[in-house]
Amino acid sequence: MPEGRAIRFGIIGCGGAAEPVCQAIAASPLAELVMLHDLNLDLARDLAERFHAPFTGALDQLLAHPTLDAVYVAVPHHQLAPLARKALEAGKHALVEKPLALTLVEADALIALAEAQRLALGVFYELRHTTAHRQARELVQAGAIGEVIGVRLQTLIDKPQSYWQSGWSGRWTNPWRGRKDEAGGGVVLMNTSHFLDAVRYITGLEVVDVSAEVGTLAANVEVEDTAAATLRFNNGALGSLFAGAHIPGARRGDEHFDIYGAQGQLRLPDPYGDDPLQVFLRRDWGGLPAGRWQALPGAPAPVYVEAIEAFARAVQQGQAPPTGGRDARQVLAIVLAIYQAAAEKRTIILSRSEATYA
């Protein structure tokens, strides 16, 4: 594919997740929106009118579009893998919403298919594109905080009960989020998975074993709304995780994570927003003074635009996307281990194919 030509996207699924992606495609010179698809024609028509693109209720019509290069797939979790497979089988690159699949078998099949077809398979873990996450990765990889010894993940959200019926946007009603067989999981899979991916990206570490408890304590749904877990990483570092979907009074900044090193620590105080990375170092490093907390300067990044453009460049250059199917598989393995550990009341050791720490 000629480098520099805009990648022509189709949208599969026109619910709440699709709107900011359509905005990002419209804002990028590297991307172009050519068609939208949803079985709910009202949803498809709404986005089509706003973003000046044709729409269809027939997936085959979208996949047969003569100029289509790639699709963005944003549908209920249980439909992600089947629809991504159809796109790949049709010869289209696929950028899929997390978690990509509900089982490792499904994820592995998609990865193998994409590689066999020489197609890009990306997953929309967009936090990698924030300024603070990039700064954190640079500091950790350069050794500024020394060896990573611990991670603390906190996901406190005050979701309305209506979330389980209509999501954040309220654009349509479908109770799939609260059904175990359709969602695959609750607050850990839907929310904390973003942090798990971010920690892998920043530290380069892998989770090797998990102990956990989960519960459904505040909502009338089949999936967890509360979870706590202990993680061990492949360098021996420890991690703690707490997630709650219905925490009264939870505010911006109550979703955050900290990375502790032998020579300093990092706090990402608002991973979804624009708050700067907070840094404490025991030693001077690269112009950063030791012994006090400081906020790193940096302009907020247009995260969705950068995620779309990173995928588009991968397609143009015939390279793997920066957040690919294997990344999503690793996160899914951690989440499934959390659920298994809670169900079986024991520590789950992830396989040696996914980690190196004995």
Regions found by a protein language model. Name each.
Residues M1-E3, I11, A70-Y72, N234, ...:
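C-terminal helix-rich "cap/oligomerization" subdomain common to oxidoreductases
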Residues M1-F51:
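N-terminal Rossmann-like dinucleotide-binding module
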Residues A109-L127, G146-V151:
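Rossmann-fold dehydrogenase core element
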Residues V21, N40, A53-L113:
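Beta-loop-alpha module in the N-terminal Rossmann-like domain of NAD(P)-dependent dehydrogenases
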Residues E3, M190, L196-G273, V305-G318, ...:
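Contiguous beta-strand/loop segments that form the cofactor/metal-binding neighborhood of enzyme cores
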Residues L39, L296-I308:
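Active-site loop of classical SDR/Rossmann-like NAD(P)-dependent oxidoreductases
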Residues G57, V96-E97, L121-V123, R152, ...:
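Hydrophobic residues in well-ordered beta-strands that form the structural core
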Residues R128-N220, K345:
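Predominantly a Rossmann-like dinucleotide-binding segment in NAD(P)-dependent oxidoreductases
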